[in-house]
Amino acid sequence: MSKLKGPDGRVGDRLPDGRPAISWQRRWTEGALPLWLVATAGGTAVIFVLGIFFYGSYTGIGNAG
């Protein structure tokens, strides 16, 4: 078992000398779900929801014509 893991199994943020335990590159690309994948899915969902609002403003009850 690694010395870096805490009692709950998570890796600590810093080594004893103050350096980060995990580089920013690994924090960005590793884990249960990579952060870039979560950000991409979230951004796509936001664009989709905004698209629904814009579509609704030009069609249906709210349109000017």
Swiss-Prot record:
GO CC annotations, alphabetized: photosystem II reaction center; plasma membrane-derived thylakoid membrane
Recorded superkingdom: Bacteria
Topology class, membrane: Single-pass membrane protein
Bilayer-crossing regions: 35-55
GO-annotated biological processes: photosynthesis
InterPro entries: PSII_PsbJ, PSII_PsbJ_sf
Subcellular localization(s) per the UniProt record: Cellular thylakoid membrane
One Pfam family cited in the UniProt record for this chain: PsbJ
Protein keywords: Membrane, Photosynthesis, Photosystem II, Reaction center, Thylakoid, Transmembrane, Transmembrane helix
Function noted in UniProt: One of the components of the core complex of photosystem II (PSII). PSII is a light-driven water:plastoquinone oxidoreductase that uses light energy to abstract electrons from H(2)O, generating O(2) and a proton gradient subsequently used for ATP formation. It consists of a core antenna complex that captures photons, and an electron transfer chain that converts photonic excitation into a charge separation.
Family: Belongs to the PsbJ family.
Quaternary structure and interacting proteins, as annotated: PSII is composed of 1 copy each of membrane proteins PsbA, PsbB, PsbC, PsbD, PsbE, PsbF, PsbH, PsbI, PsbJ, PsbK, PsbL, PsbM, PsbT, PsbX, PsbY, Psb30/Ycf12, peripheral proteins PsbO, CyanoQ (PsbQ), PsbU, PsbV and a large number of cofactors. It forms dimeric complexes.
Protein name: Photosystem II reaction center protein J
Highest classification ranks of the organism: Bacteria, Bacillati, Cyanobacteriota, Cyanophyceae, Synechococcales
